[in-house]
Amino acid sequence: MQARELIQKFITKVSTFPETTYTAEDEQYLFNVVLDLVGEGDETPVVAQETTTLIDLKEALVQLAVDHQRIQDLAAERDILGAKLMDLVTPLPSAVNKRFWTLYEKDPEKALAYFYELSQANDYIKVAAIAKNIAYDVPTKYGDLEITINLSKPEKDPKQIALAKTMKQTGYPKCQLCLENEGYAGRLDFPARRNHRIVRFDLEQQTWGFQYSPYAYFNEHSIFLDGKHEPMVIDQTTFKNLLQIVKQFPGYFAGSNADLPIVGGSILTHEHYQGGRHDFPMAKAPISTPLQFAGYDDIQAGIVEWPMSVMRLTGSDAKRIETLAADILTKWQHYSDPEVQVLAQEADGTPHHTITPIARMRGDQYEIDLVLRDNQTSPEHPDGIYHPHADVQHIKKENIGLIEVMGLAILPPRLKSEMAEVEKYLCDQPNEMAAYHKTWADQIKADHSAITPANVTTLVQNEVGKVFMRVLEDAGVFKRDAKGQAAFIKFTERVNNA
């Protein structure tokens, strides 16, 4: 088809998009806006196969802009232009917020469905890219763990990296979680957010934002962000906020990354939580040891049967749960037990202890899981005593954040090709297996006598799952053996004592 025909097809889709208010009188204007974005060029026929959906047409127009030398063939410039094109079907922030809260008054579930569907339809949530991820479950003694190899985020082009280094740093937006991102065009070193929308809501009389994650790791992966650019802090307000969010956003869990390096998430500079509609393995795990806290007979409590050190609190009164959780946090921040290598802080006062909290509703009951974290390092474990140890870092060496804590592994893209080479090695075929996988692969060979091309993929997937289980055990402060659990009980007794 001709370039102008492609533009017209896109405009037809735009003008009939359910959330737009365009009329026939707007079509010429829209045509010229798109023509300006992609460049006029000549009328050389455009190669555009299967361009039937709005997003397919957008991709074809981005390629047209590259062909017309309107933009460079760089992932960032493609994303920037793509977001500008999809902004044409995205209502203004005020309209999105009005629609969301009008629906919410009648049915909160319909409001969530509206915003989620819009965020997919306007290509803010990268549905096609997310579909590239590899995902499978692996049975373990803690239940099924969820394994994902993250292929959705494009690798950074070396040329793009080099160009980004030459750009002037503006300091705007302050970070990728600021409200300033809404509608921001993007740069080579900062993601395009022209088609990004944020729903505002009140949390403890403060303005917060609710959005979806563009590269979701699970169903309806959400981010709840503070309207102010302030550092992450885990305190009583955190527990109060999480419990309010799960009440306000039905069907969603809400959790926070820890607020210390090594055990925290990748962004510690902006207060935010994550949530979504997903039942994680940890949420399914039962209580292994019931607990009772003095003065809290109305709250069910216990140690969760999980590789990390988790205390679960359940009850009908959010304020009571919040208060007990805050007491546990305070005690943990000052608790040391040298017998099991637990140290609250250094001599200079540098803190080591915090909590990764996750809240959810169980019917009319509030539930919060408190995952104890310790970010000590040692000569033996320079990356962290309670961090993936060296012998499992060939699979996972990054921080164990909120999502991994709950039993969903987010593994790096390199593992797709690397595991294929491991499979060849296990089948005694010519291979280019990375040397750092050899010890692990040899152990797999020793443990399994009948490895064939027919079963090797499932076998390797299961072994990756076992490594992830070990990763979580490494991150657990009180180990699951008798000594570790006795030490855990000892800490819970401290909570009961002033």
Curated annotation (Swiss-Prot):
Q: Which organism is it from?
A: Latilactobacillus sakei subsp. sakei (strain 23K) (Lactobacillus sakei subsp. sakei)
Question: Tell me, what is an example of a GO biological process annotation in this record?
Answer: galactose metabolic process
**What are the entry keywords?**
Carbohydrate metabolism, Cytoplasm, Galactose metabolism, Nucleotidyltransferase, Transferase
Membrane-crossing ranges are none
Q: Which GO terms describe its cellular component?
A: cytoplasm
Q: Which family does it belong to?
A: Belongs to the galactose-1-phosphate uridylyltransferase type 2 family.
Task: Kindly list any coiled-coil regions of this protein.
Answer: none
Can you provide one Gene Ontology molecular function annotated for this UniProt record?
UDP-glucose:hexose-1-phosphate uridylyltransferase activity
EC numbers: 2.7.7.12
- Cite the NCBIfam families for this sequence: galT_2 (TIGR01239), PRK05270.1-2 (NF003629), PRK05270.1-5 (NF003631), PRK05270.2-2 (NF003633)
Query: Catalytic activity, per the record?
Result: alpha-D-galactose 1-phosphate + UDP-alpha-D-glucose = alpha-D-glucose 1-phosphate + UDP-alpha-D-galactose
The name this protein goes by in its record: Galactose-1-phosphate uridylyltransferase
Where's it found, cell-wise? Cytoplasm
This protein's record includes keyword Manganese: no
Q: In which pathway does it act?
A: Carbohydrate metabolism; galactose metabolism
Q: Does the keyword Transferase apply?
A: yes
